[in-house]
């Protein structure tokens, strides 16, 4: 994985976590989790579903869909992945 793709992935997950945006997480086996991203690392994502946190391996993920539109652009998401602060677009 290139640094740019890692930054986009990290920025996307970090934005969902930081802004407490609910998401539907689709797994490769077809199962869906609807909840909140609580944390992540290189290999796993912690998802809170119905008040309980589940640790899901990234290789089991297919798609993550936010419940509402994200308030920022892709370039801002990438900056969030690099640890920079991101402000919403007007």
From Swiss-Prot:
Matching Gene3D superfamilies, A to Z?
A: 2.30.30.100
Identify the domain of life.
Bacteria
Among InterPro entries, the record links this protein to: Hfq, LSM_dom_sf, Sm
Q: Which UniProt keywords apply?
A: RNA-binding, Stress response
Gene Ontology biological process: regulation of DNA-templated transcription; regulation of RNA stability; regulation of translation, ncRNA-mediated
User: What does the record list as coiled-coil region(s)?
Assistant: none
Q: Which residues form the Sm domain?
A: 10-70
Gene Ontology cellular-component annotations: cytosol
Q: Which GO terms describe its molecular function?
A: RNA binding
HAMAP family, per database record = Hfq
Q: How does it assemble?
A: Homohexamer.
Annotated function: RNA chaperone that binds small regulatory RNA (sRNAs) and mRNAs to facilitate mRNA translational regulation in response to envelope stress, environmental stress and changes in metabolite concentrations. Also binds with high specificity to tRNAs.
Family named by the database record = Belongs to the Hfq family.
Which PANTHER family does this UniProt record tie to the protein?
Answer: RNA-BINDING PROTEIN HFQ
Name this polypeptide is given: RNA-binding protein Hfq
